[in-house]
Every structure is written in structure tokens, then in C-alpha cells.
Amino acid sequence: MSTSHTKLELALDLQIATDNKQLPTQQDFELWVRTALRNTMTEAELTVRVVDAEESQALNSTYRGKDKPTNVLSFPFEAPAEIELPLLGDLIICASVVEHEAIQQNKPLQAHWAHMVVHGCLHLLGYDHINDIEAEEMESIETQLIESLGFNNPYKEQ
């Protein structure tokens, strides 16, 4: 398992807004964020907020027009061109949806958490999966990053 990284100064604000007890540690989140951002920047600030289904559903409804909770929402920070800030943005991750999906997809919970963090960070970096070409590129990068963490390809049937 390769975890070598370009030196990244990371300021990660982890906010826990759920009663769920099966959550990764601060160190887990930092490792996954560092892995997703490796070789892309030298300094980054972001917030990861772990929420319950109610908050996820409200945000998903407001910002995506979908009235249901979702696994991860990404909110990139867009600074004016003349301002240089290392602020990447915010990830909102719904603990109960991540747990449900891990069970449904027969994946280890920790592996699915890692995948959701990496997936969200790639969105913050500007990757998307709206069309097939973008989806293939994003999935390929995700798979490489997840496998470098010692987890299985998240898109393969388990």
C-alpha cells in the first residue's frame, strides 16, 4: 500500500453533526483527503461535515432539487480571480446513507467512507461524471486512489 504524498499543508475542519457512532477518525479523513489531493496542490483548507439524513435531504433538496438524502455533496469554494486562498470547499457526507450503501453494495464500511471522501474531493478539484467520458476519467482516478489506500476497486461488484 503506497501512501507517499507530495508535502501538503492540510487544514481539515471535521464537523460531526450526527449521533452515528460508526464514524472514521480524524486521521482517517485526513489520510483520505491527502490521498485525493496528492500532487495537485501544496496547501489546502476544507471542511468535511458528517450529517444525519435530515440535514443531507434538506441540502440536497435546496442545492440539487432532489428531495432525498444523498451520500456526499461537494461545495467548491470559488474565490475571485485576484484572491489566492487555499480554501478548497466543503464536503457534506451523510453517515446513514454511506452505511446503507456499504451494506447494499457488500463493501467494507471503511472502504466506502474512503471512496466517498475521495469522490467528494475530486468534485472539489473540478472533476465530474455528467457524461460518459467524464465519468470514465473520474472513476479511473478514484479507482487508482482507492486501491493505493489498500481498498478494492469501488466500481467492481464485490
From Swiss-Prot:
PROSITE patterns: UPF0054 (PS01306). Pfam families: YbeY. Its EC number is 3.1.-.-. Keywords: Cytoplasm, Endonuclease, Hydrolase, Metal-binding, Nuclease, Ribosome biogenesis, rRNA processing, Zinc. The keyword Transcription does not apply. It is found in: Cytoplasm. Zn(2+) binds at residues 119, 123, 129. Binds 1 zinc ion. Its cofactor is Zn(2+). The keyword Cytoplasm applies. GO terms for molecular function: metalloendopeptidase activity; RNA endonuclease activity; zinc ion binding. GO terms for cellular component: cytoplasm. Belongs to the endoribonuclease YbeY family. Single strand-specific metallo-endoribonuclease involved in late-stage 70S ribosome quality control and in maturation of the 3' terminus of the 16S rRNA. This is Endoribonuclease YbeY. It comes from Shewanella woodyi (strain ATCC 51908 / MS32).
